[in-house]
């Protein structure tokens, strides 16, 4: 946080700070009056008291200025930190989702059923019939079109992130689509730039905007050309239409309160998508702010706090060029939206007092203000003692002479008590702000961690079911049914397909093909000898049985393995022979969804590596100083950056993955409670004593992503079909140490509990 704050702009919107400022000004004026009265009425012996009052008044002025500036900085930092985290998390979720789309389009464009069918359409089926360019689909082509449509639908049924999948020939004519509707007028041939680029380019092409093939709203399309399986001539283009609007609303919904707006921008600040189109509509242009300094910006006559986040590449992919996310909060709502839970009141008194004793580590301004307030109270007390000791006594009956300074002493005592109450409340508020900021950070972090996990597992569940539809793998198993090993040609074909898949989807350590008896026939990364599922080995009996019993092509099974003490999960899907009557035009089957199981595909998901990468991206490791364990930042005048640990854990607390080393996998963190009772979608953050330290503890349970873990019917069917996704039961956990437990905190809390309460609140 930069040290310069636009105080005049921010201060009017901080009600609590303004109330404290008014009280402190009143206190300062009262001390000025006391000092003036003492100067007028003090005797020669009372000059020491006047000097002490001057020091007190000056100390109060410095304390007032420092306290207000600290409260202002803390409130501004909390607001900017929340906006920054939400903006960064939004672009991170989007980029990871779109990375999967680039792999999907590459996989499906190589599908041999699609390529063979497109070749037949273009070749006129070797019967001299007109090709696609001569006028589109005709009656003779209807069975082939139905075959293509069914094949596309079998893919889309497993990936609802796509609202349509289309096949275009080289002239831009739509040949088939997953979402075909009877009676719908076909779109005109496509001649758009992205389509022409797809025909000429080997890799995928992405396009966002209007398109004649999908009229209506702007679309995000991932396209890649299809090649003739024998001549390698370009046959057309496969188009995956991403359900962009629903995805953006899901990402925005996982962010902050309604008092702010989330945006997706291009590199020039043009709004592509908005969480509230009635507030800031797509097509608007907004100012951007990539730094963390508080710099209010004006848009459409309203002043906002703004944080913009650029994409960080994931697996080398950074999303469409220039895309970035931004969160904007109106200045008049940004601080009103800050929740002020009674953090200290909810804590055990001993923990609250211990945190104040450790404030230097997690909130240096709070530590400085508390020490300054103690110094002021000490000066006031010394002044009262000094004045009382200098009051002259009457020789008659030991009574004191009436002295003008006595009124000053009385005012000094009353004002000292009031000063203590006002500063106690202000410091209490600063303490609340510091702690609530960190608690909110942990809530936001854990919500992101679960969003990342569920989206990742959604992709894994869909990958295995997609690839089980691969015609080349089905053919290998069919042609070699009953053989002890694959022929050289079949082995080469299978391994080549598996290597191509693994090259597209790098999150897998290995992809293996096995027969109905569980014998692994081929795999990717065969040269990596230490990995499970090598050719010639067998799939675990329980996993094989679960895979064979899978109900249909929509079901899958997850197997948990122990690879040298490290967790590894294997996603299994069944490959099926074509069922009777499933063959369509020209003797080709489309997917083999309901036939008997002839084998399976196994995706070795390196759980620790991939989950650790997610944790490290969301909670990067901070360098720490030796004295306080807090990272130093010369540009940061707010809260120090304390090291934070993040985990994915089982409900019983066993660590499955950790952001940083130091804790053995499979171990539990003593003192962390409440994981088993987390409800779906619940997020918690609290302050606990753990391992001899005061710690912020955050945790969250998944709330589901699309149909993944949401549809109760699907969940029931999954149980019946032996689908057991153990990863889906994980929860996230974060831990941040604020400082060692203070030895005298409990005794101090007991003493303060019995102390006079001047402001109606527990003394701080």
Predicted segment positions?
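Short, surface-exposed beta-strand-loop junctions and turns on beta-sheet-rich folds
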Residues: 181-183, 213, 278-280, 312, ...
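Intrinsically disordered, low-complexity domain-flanking/linker segments in eukaryotic proteins
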Residues: 126-133, 579-593, 622-634, 710-723
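Conserved long hydrophobic alpha-helices within structured protein cores
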Residues: 102-110, 219, 237-241, 298-308, ...
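Solvent-exposed, extracytoplasmic
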Residues: 147-159, 237-290, 331-358, 493-505, ...
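Extracellular/periplasmic juxtamembrane segments that couple receptor/chemosensory ectodomains to their
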Residues: 2-74, 284-437, 667-764
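Extracytoplasmic/periplasmic ligand-binding sensor regions of membrane-associated signaling proteins
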Residues: 149, 154-247, 293-305, 500-614, ...
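Conserved beta-strand and immediately adjacent loop positions that scaffold enzyme active sites
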Residues: 104, 164, 220-223, 261-262, ...
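Extracytoplasmic/periplasmic sensory segments of membrane signal-transduction proteins
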Residues: 17, 27-200, 386-552, 615-618, ...
């Amino acid at each position: 946080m930069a040290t310069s704050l636009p105080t005049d702009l921010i201060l009017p919107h901080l009600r609590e700070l303004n109330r404290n400022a008014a009280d402190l000004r009143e206190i300062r004026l009262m001390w000025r009056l006391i000092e003036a009265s003492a100067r007028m009425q003090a005797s020669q012996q009372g000059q020491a008291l006047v000097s002490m009052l001057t020091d007190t008044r000056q100390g109060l002025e410095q304390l007032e200025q420092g306290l207000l500036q600290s409260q202002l900085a803390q409130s501004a930092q909390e607001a900017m930190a929340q906006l920054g985290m939400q903006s960064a998390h939004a672009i991170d979720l989007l980029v990871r989702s779109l990375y999967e789309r680039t792999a999907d389009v590459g996989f499906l464009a190589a599908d041999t059923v699609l390529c063979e069918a497109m070749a037949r359409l273009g070749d006129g089926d070797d019967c001299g019939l007109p090709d696609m360019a001569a006028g589109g689909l005709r009656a003779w082509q209807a069975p082939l079109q139905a075959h293509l449509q069914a094949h596309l639908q079998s893919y889309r049924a497993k990936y609802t992130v796509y609202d349509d999948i289309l096949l275009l020939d080289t002239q831009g004519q739509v040949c088939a689509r997953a979402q075909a509707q009877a009676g719908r007028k076909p779109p005109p041939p496509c001649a758009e730039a992205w389509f022409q680029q797809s025909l000429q380019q080997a890799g995928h092409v992405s396009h966002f905007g209007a398109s004649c093939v999908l009229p209506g709203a702007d679309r995000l399309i991932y396209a890649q050309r299809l090649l003739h399986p024998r001549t390698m001539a370009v046959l057309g283009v496969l188009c995956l239409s991403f359900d962009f609007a629903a995805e953006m609303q899901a990402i925005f919904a996982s962010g902050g309160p309604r008092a702010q707006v989330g945006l997706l921008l291009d590199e020039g600040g043009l709004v592509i998508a908005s969480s509230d189109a009635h507030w800031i509509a797509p097509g608007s242009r907004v100012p951007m702010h990539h730094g963390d300094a508080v710099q209010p910006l004006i848009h459409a006559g309203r002043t906002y706090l703004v944080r913009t986040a650029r994409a960080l590449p994931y697996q080398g992919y950074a999303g469409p060029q220039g895309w970035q996310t931004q969160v904007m909060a109106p200045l008049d709502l940004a601080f009103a939206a800050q929740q002020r839970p009674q953090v200290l009141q909810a804590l055990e008194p001993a923990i609250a007092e211990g945190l104040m004793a450790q404030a230097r580590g997690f909130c240096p301004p709070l530590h400085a203000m508390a020490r300054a307030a103690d110094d002021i109270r000490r000066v006031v007390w010394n002044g009262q003692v000094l004045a009382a000791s200098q009051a002259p006594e009457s020789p008659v009956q030991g009574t004191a002479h009436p002295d003008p300074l006595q009124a000053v002493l009385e005012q000094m005592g009353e004002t000292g008590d009031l000063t203590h109450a006002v500063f106690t409340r202000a410091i209490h508020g600063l303490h609340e702000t510091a702690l609530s900021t960190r608690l909110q950070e942990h809530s936001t972090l854990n919500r992101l961690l679960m969003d990342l996990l569920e989206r990742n597992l959604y992709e894994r569940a869909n990958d295995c079911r997609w690839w089980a539809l691969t015609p080349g793998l089905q053919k290998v198993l069919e042609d070699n049914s009953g053989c002890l090993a694959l022929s050289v040609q079949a082995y080469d074909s299978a391994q080549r397909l598996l290597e191509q898949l693994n090259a597209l989807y790098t999150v897998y350590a290995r992809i293996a093909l096995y027969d109905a008896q569980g014998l692994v026939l081929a795999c990717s990364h065969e040269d990596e000898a230490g990995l499970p599922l090598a050719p010639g080995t067998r799939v675990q009996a329980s996993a094989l049985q679960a895979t064979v019993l899978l109900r249909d092509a929509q079901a899958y099974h997850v197997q948990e393995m122990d690879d040298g003490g490290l967790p590894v999960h294997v996603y299994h899907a069944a490959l099926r022979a074509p069922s009777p009557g499933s063959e369509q035009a020209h003797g080709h089957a489309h997917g083999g969804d309901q036939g008997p199981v002839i084998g399976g595909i196994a995706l070795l998901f390196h759980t620790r590596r991939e989950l650790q990468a997610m944790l490290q991206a969301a909670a990067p490791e901070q360098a720490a100083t030796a004295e306080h364990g807090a990272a130093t930042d010369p540009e940061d005048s707010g809260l120090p950056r304390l090291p934070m640990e993040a985990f994915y854990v089982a409900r019983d607390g066993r660590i499955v993955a950790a952001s940083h080393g130091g804790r053995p996998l499979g171990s539990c963190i003593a003192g962390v409670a409440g994981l088993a009772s987390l409800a779906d979608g619940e997020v918690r953050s609290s302050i606990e004593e753990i391992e001899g330290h005061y710690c912020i503890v955050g945790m969250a349970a998944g709330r589901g992503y699309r149909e993944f873990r949401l549809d109760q019917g699907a969940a029931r069917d999954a149980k019946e079909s032996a689908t057991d996704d153990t990863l889906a039961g994980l929860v996230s956990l974060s831990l941040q140490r604020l400082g060692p437990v203070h030895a005298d905190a409990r005794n101090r809390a007991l003493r303060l509990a019995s102390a006079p309460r001047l402001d109606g609140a527990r003394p701080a």
